[in-house]
C-alpha cells in the first residue's frame, strides 16, 4: 500500500552533471520537420543536448500539451492569441517553440547555462520573435514577470528514466516538493498552473497538499500526463 512506502522510495536520488551538446543526431525524432526545414532555410542549426534527448517535449508531445491547454482556455472563453504563457522550465525549447505558434507571447525561463544557450540558438534558428528568454530560477523571478501572464507551465526534471522504477513517484524541484512549488505559484496569484509529469506521479499526495481547488488530469499514451490546476 502507498502508506507503507517511504519518501526515499518514492523520490530517486540522481547525481547532476552538466548537459553536453550533441552532434550528428537525427533531429526529426525531436523537432517538427517543418521547423527543421525552416532552420535550414535560415542557414542555422537546431541543437540538442544529451539531457535533451530524454527531457525535451518532442514536437508531437508538445503539440498534444498545447492542444489540451488551448481547449481548456477556449472552454473559459479565452482566446490563446490574446494570452501570454510562462514556460518555467524551458530546457532547449520543445514546449516554448510550440507555444509560440499559438500564444501571443512566451516567457521562457531556463536555469542551466548550457540549455539557455541552446534555447537561445533554437529560437534564433527558427526566427521566432514572440519568445522572451530568461536565464534564472523561475522562483526567483516570478514576481517580476507574473503581471505579464497568469498562465504558468512547467515540466520539472523526472530524474532521467529512473521514474519508471517506482509505482508512485514524487516530483521535486531542488529540495522543494512539487506541491510546495505549486503552492508558491498559488501565493503569487498565478491563476492557471500547468504541470507536465510522468504517468505515475503521486496524485493523491499532490492533490491533498495544494491550495488550488481544481485539477484536471489529461493522460497521453507516451508515459506522461499534464495537470491543469486552477482556482
Please place each PLM-identified region on the residue numbering.
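S-adenosyl-L-methionine
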Residues: 1-84
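C-terminal catalytic and target-recognition region of SAM-dependent MTase-like enzymes
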Residues: 4-42, 185-186, 190-231
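S-adenosylmethionine
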Residues: 145-214, 218
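Short coil/turn segments at beta-strand junctions that form active-site/ligand-binding loops
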Residues: 13, 81-83, 104, 147-150, ...
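A short acidic, often aromatic-flanked loop/helix-cap motif at beta-alpha or helix-coil junctions
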Residues: 54, 139-142, 220-223
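SAM cofactor-binding core of SAM-dependent methyltransferases
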Residues: 56-140
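Short, flexible, glycine/charge-rich loop motifs used to bind or transfer phosphoryl groups or to couple energy/partner
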Residues: 36, 96, 141-143, 182-184
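Generic short N-terminal amphipathic or hydrophobic helices
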Residues: 4, 127-130, 150
